[in-house]
């Protein structure tokens, strides 16, 4: 059953839709001081870092998801350049394949990453930011996100990272459960409104620990 709060939130977003996007971002953190347990690889997936030649495949997946896609529409070719810039500045994209089929995409950022519209997260030494996780529908519910995320965190820890951050959406509770199961804790929320046609959001309310999102 959908809660009253959820219905009210959906109604608020519908009311705001003609004027822009009303959204609530959940900010999560996780310590990397202790070893990161790796989930089981039940599908026998292979995981590797993406290369520039993989970008067309990655963009094809992201283009249908407005939360992940960095373009203004599914055919916005400038988005590819933004993902290319990520790779060239040293951020890492992890790809998981099952029997040669792409089963998951995820990113680890070490310097800065796209977070709230027009407000990137600026990272300090020892911090990482994971973002833009995507699992194609045939592989959802099969542990791919947990497997790749665990691999990313473990590798970052081996390379000296001590703290990780990520963002979630209020209306994706299943994803929040998965993060908490992997040791993440919600530490803050940001309510914001992005006017139609704008590139930078206006903040309506924020609470909890959100400081890393506002270092710019």
Model-derived features: positions:
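Conserved active-site alpha-helix within GNAT-family acetyltransferase domains
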Residues: 9, 170-189
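Conserved acetyl-CoA-binding loop-helix of GNAT-fold acetyltransferases
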Residues: 132-135, 141-157, 181
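Short secondary-structure boundary/hinge segments and terminal tails
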Residues: 157, 174, 196-198
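A conserved beta-strand-loop-helix scaffold within acyl/acetyltransferase catalytic domains
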Residues: 66-127, 131-138
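Acyl-donor-binding surface of acyltransferase catalytic domains
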Residues: 1-61, 68-73, 78-82
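Conserved GNAT acetyl-CoA-binding A-motif
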Residues: 156-168
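Charge-rich, low-complexity intrinsically disordered segments
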Residues: 181-183, 197-216
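Conserved catalytic-core motifs of GNAT/GCN5-like acyltransferases
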Residues: 28, 185-200
């Amino acid at each position: 059953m959908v809660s009253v709060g959820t219905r009210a939130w959906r109604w608020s977003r519908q009311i705001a839709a003609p004027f822009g996007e009303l959204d609530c971002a959940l900010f999560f953190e996780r310590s990397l001081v202790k070893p990161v347990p790796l989930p089981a690889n039940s599908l026998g997936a292979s995981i590797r870092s993406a290369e520039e030649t993989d970008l067309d495949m990655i963009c094809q997946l992201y283009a249908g998801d407005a939360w992940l896609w960095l373009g203004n529409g599914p055919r916005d070719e400038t988005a590819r350049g933004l993902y290319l810039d990520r790779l060239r500045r040293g951020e890492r994209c992890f790809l998981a394949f099952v029997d040669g089929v792409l089963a998951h995409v995820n990113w680890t950022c070490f310097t800065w990453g796209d977070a709230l519209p027009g407000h990137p997260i600026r990272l300090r030494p020892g911090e990482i930011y994971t973002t833009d996780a995507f699992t194609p529908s045939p592989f959802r519910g099969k542990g791919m996100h947990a497997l790749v995320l665990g691999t990313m965190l473990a590798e970052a820890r081996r390379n000296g990272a001590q703290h990780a951050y990520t963002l979630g959406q209020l209306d994706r509770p299943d994803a929040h459960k998965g993060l908490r199961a992997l040791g993440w804790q919600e530490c803050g929320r940001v309510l914001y409104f992005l006017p139609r046609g704008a590139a930078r959001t206006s903040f309506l309310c924020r609470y909890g620990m959100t400081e890393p999102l506002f270092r710019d």
